[in-house]
A protein has these predicted regions:
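Small-residue-biased structural context
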Residues: 2-171
Length: 171
C-alpha cells in the first residue's frame, strides 16, 4: 500500500479505546481497517489517480476478508451462539465491497464520500455492537483468548503467505 502522510485534519475515522473488544489481535486488526479506510478517504479527497485508489480499495477488501475469516474462526472455535448472524453481516458487507470494486474498476464509477461514510458507520456500529457481543460472550464462557490469539497469528501469517498480501509486515 502506498504511504500517505496524514495530518490530523485528514483523519476521517479515528480509533477510540471505546471500540476495543478486549481481544488484542482483533483490536489491532480493527485499527488497521480504520487506517486503510483513512488512506482511501485521503486518496479520494486528493483526487488521486484511479490506479492508486484501486490499490487501496483492493487492500481494504482483501484485509477485510482476511479479518472476517479469522474472526469467524474464533467464533466457531468458541461455539458462539450468534455466529451465523454475525457471519451473515460479514457476507453482506463483503458483497457490497465487491460490487463497489467492480463498479469502480469495470464501469469506472467514482468512489463517493457517501460510500466512505457508509463504511465508517458500518465498521463503527459493527465493532461496538456485534463484535462486542461475541467478545463478551466468549469471555463469560471462559474461552481462552490467549490460546486463540497465538493460533490466530499463525493462521493469519499462513493466509498472507498464500495471498502474498502486504499486511504480513504488521504482525
Amino acid at each position: 500500500m502506498s504511504e500517505l502522510a496524514m495530518s490530523n485534519e485528514e483523519v476521517f475515522f479515528k480509533w477510540s479505546p471505546d471500540y476495543s473488544v478486549d481481544i488484542k489481535t482483533i483490536d489491532n486488526q480493527h485499527q488497521e481497517l480504520i487506517c486503510i479506510l483513512n488512506h482511501l478517504f485521503i486518496a479520494v479527497s486528493r483526487r488521486q489517480a484511479d490506479k492508486e485508489i484501486a490499490v487501496i480499495l483492493d487492500d481494504l477488501v482483501g484485509y477485510t476478508k482476511t479479518h472476517f475469516a479469522l474472526e469467524e474462526r474464533l467464533m466457531q472455535q468458541a461455539n458462539y451462539e450468534g455466529f451465523e448472524a454475525h457471519k451473515l453481516e460479514h457476507k453482506k458487507l463483503i458483497e457490497r465491497l465487491d460490487q463497489l470494486g467492480k463498479k469502480f474498476m469495470l464501469e469506472e464509477k467514482p468512489i463517493h464520500f457517501e460510500l466512505l461514510s457508509f463504511l465508517k458507520s458500518w465498521l463503527k456500529e459493527h465493532i461496538q455492537d456485534s463484535d462486542k457481543k461475541y467478545s463478551s460472550a466468549l469471555q463469560k464462557k471462559g474461552f481462552s483468548i490467549a490460546a486463540w490469539e497465538s493460533e490466530a497469528t499463525a493462521a493469519f501469517i499462513e493466509m498472507v503467505e498464500k495471498t502474498g498480501r502486504w499486511w504480513k509486515k504488521i504482525w
